[in-house]
UniProtKB/Swiss-Prot annotation:
Keyword Membrane on entry: no
Protein name: Hemoglobin subunit alpha-D
Taxonomic classification: Eukaryota, Metazoa, Chordata, Craniata, Vertebrata
Expression (tissue specificity): Red blood cells.
Keyword Heme: yes
GO CC aspect terms: blood microparticle; haptoglobin-hemoglobin complex; hemoglobin complex
UniProt-listed GO biological process terms: hydrogen peroxide catabolic process
Length: 141
């Protein structure tokens, strides 16, 4: 459960991410494909090479969804409902993969933000990503 402090910290973090979110989304996906190659199976029609336009485009979508989730933090289920339906019913993505992408996004933020990515931000963002993953997995039940 995200506290009021967590939400405040997330807003501060997302201000730092603004302007870089597309780049960070792309890098998180590229990192996931290298670190967890089994995730590539969900993208058989993509060129998965680093710098691929398809990966960049999907990274942009991931970042936009996270940005929307940050803005709609008090109503994640409604904000992510369409995305949850898409991943559960159409794409049939194993929900365990949401955690893998979350880990990769955490690494990207740590690399790019350095000391500005405080332990408090890391903890709040981890809780947030867990909440997002839980909402995305709701339709699987």
């Amino acid at each position: 459960m995200l506290t009021a402090d967590d939400k405040k910290i997330l807003a501060q973090l997302w201000e730092k991410v603004a302007g870089h979110q597309d780049e960070f989304g792309n890098e998180a996906l590229e990192r996931m494909f290298v670190t967890y190659p089994q995730t590539k199976t969900y993208f058989p029609h993509f060129d998965l090479h680093p710098g691929s336009e398809q990966v960049r485009s999907h990274g942009k979508k991931v970042a936009a969804a996270l940005s929307n989730a940050v803005k709609s933090i008090d109503n994640l289920s409604q904000a992510l409902s369409e995305l949850s339906n898409l991943h559960a019913y159409n794409l049939r993505v194993d929900p365990a993969n949401f955690k893998l992408l979350s880990q990769c996004f955490q690494v990207v933020l740590a690399v790019h933000l350095g000391k500005d990515y405080t332990p408090e931000m890391h903890a709040a963002f981890d809780k947030f990503l867990s909440a997002v993953a839980a909402v995305l997995a709701e339709k699987y039940r």
